[in-house]
Amino acid sequence: MLWHVYLRKGTVLVPTVAKTDAGFFIDVEPVAVVESTNRQEIISAIKAAIGRGNPIVATPTRAEFPKPVVLKYANVKSWATFEKNAFCWTVKKNASAFELHSPRMNVPKPWEEGPVKIETFDTEAAIDILSCSIADQVRGTV
């Protein structure tokens, strides 16, 4: 399972992440849009997205592959423009734990592959602790 939390210019975007029949993940509606200063709403949006799981969707063909759903909420037309001023936290869940992959900070291109901070949450309250950790990191990034 997988989820994304994006921060761009003071706005937090938390899309639903669907899994295609082919096995890859794409961001889909609904997308929560929250001000980065509102810790409680960030936490609620993350919990809601995780609660929705990863719905299964048909694999789009190359011709019908949609633009990233978060672009319209960020008021940009291209992924390249979006990622210039955005950070992405990725949450992965396996059988026993959640992993939080935090973005590289203070680097020219934080989206490039490279070392990231990975935290593991395997307690009973993992979703609560994970959501609070992301909200605090988001607020510390602004």
Tell where the protein language model's regions lie, with residue ranges:
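Intrinsically disordered, low-complexity regulatory segments enriched in Ser/Thr/Pro
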Residues: M1-T37, K93-C132, D136, G140
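Negatively charged, low-complexity tracts enriched in Asp/Glu with abundant Ser/Thr
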Residues: E35-F87, V107, W111-K117
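Surface-exposed interaction/gating patches
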Residues: W79-K93, F98-H101
